[in-house]
Amino acid sequence: MPEATNIQVVIASGLDNEENNDHLVQSSDPQHPANLIPEMCRKFYTWGWVTGTGGGTSIRHGDHIFIAPSGVQKELIQPENIFVMQFPTPKYPPSERKYIRKPKNLKPSDCTPLFLTAFERGAMCCIHTHSQWAVLVTLLVERIYGKEAHFEISNIEQIKGIPKGKGKGMHNYHDTLRIPIIDNTPFEEDLTEGLERAIAANPDTYAVLVRRHGIYVWGDTPAKAKTQCESLDWLFQLAVEMHKLGLPWDINKTK
């Protein structure tokens, strides 16, 4: 995890943007990405999803991508701290990425290529959390079913909050929800290949768990990405508690 930046000092020092595109993050609309990302990050912090500078959030708005900075206290982010990229943009090398606004003294998110992977498949918002429940679920799946297994759960009302795939509606109560799991890597950007493979093998998924790390969740709108992330986190916590009681996650497997 990057060393934490004292974001309050950065804010006080002002900004010196090479492109002078401050207008991109200035809006009175609370739903504007530059306002919405800080608000979402504050909520995620209170929920324990982005503790200790971990995690991140990005929103695509037309041909622009708005991204929270890396290595900062997420609950303190302000609109002027947001990076803006042109979309589409190359994932690699990082030097080729088309930033059109870079706040001074802040580092672009290490999650950037993973966010771009989600946007390339049509997502409009991608959220990365370090939820304890997501981490615990990856450990339980590995111990019970092995490293190649997905997280699977059925016959729980909350799975109806997760899409079955683009244009395929939402999961039904009796369906089995499957979330792929990839291995963690020493550096965040190195997760990109694993995420791409998981999406290729599971083209309908809206989330990928990262073992011993957290989860990436995306949606067709920022609101959908947020509510899907909430539903998944609720399901992960429930799964941990069910395991304590010896209750199966996927009733369809026991029939």
From Swiss-Prot:
Instruction: List this protein's GO terms for biological process.
Output: L-methionine salvage from methylthioadenosine
Essential cofactor(s): Zn(2+)
Give the main EC class.
Answer: lyase
What are the record's GO terms for cellular component? cytoplasm
Q: Name one Pfam family in it.
A: Aldolase_II
Please indicate which superkingdom the organism of origin belongs to.
Answer: Eukaryota
Q: Which reaction does it catalyse?
A: 5-(methylsulfanyl)-D-ribulose 1-phosphate = 5-methylsulfanyl-2,3-dioxopentyl phosphate + H2O
What residues form the catalytic site here? 157
Q: Which UniProt keywords apply?
A: Amino-acid biosynthesis, Cytoplasm, Lyase, Metal-binding, Methionine biosynthesis, Zinc
Q: Where in the cell is it found?
A: Cytoplasm
Q: Which residues bind Zn(2+)?
A: 128, 130, 213
Quote the record's binding site residues for substrate: 111
Question: EC number(s) of the enzyme?
Answer: 4.2.1.109
Presence of the UniProt keyword Repeat in the record: no
The molecular function terms in GO held by this entry are: methylthioribulose 1-phosphate dehydratase activity; zinc ion binding
From the record, give the transmembrane residue ranges: none
* NCBIfam families according to UniProt: salvage_mtnB
This chain's function reads:
Catalyzes the dehydration of methylthioribulose-1-phosphate (MTRu-1-P) into 2,3-diketo-5-methylthiopentyl-1-phosphate (DK-MTP-1-P).
As for family, the record states: Belongs to the aldolase class II family. MtnB subfamily.
Name of protein? Methylthioribulose-1-phosphate dehydratase
- Please name the source species: Talaromyces stipitatus (strain ATCC 10500 / CBS 375.48 / QM 6759 / NRRL 1006)
Q: Which gene encodes it?
A: mde1
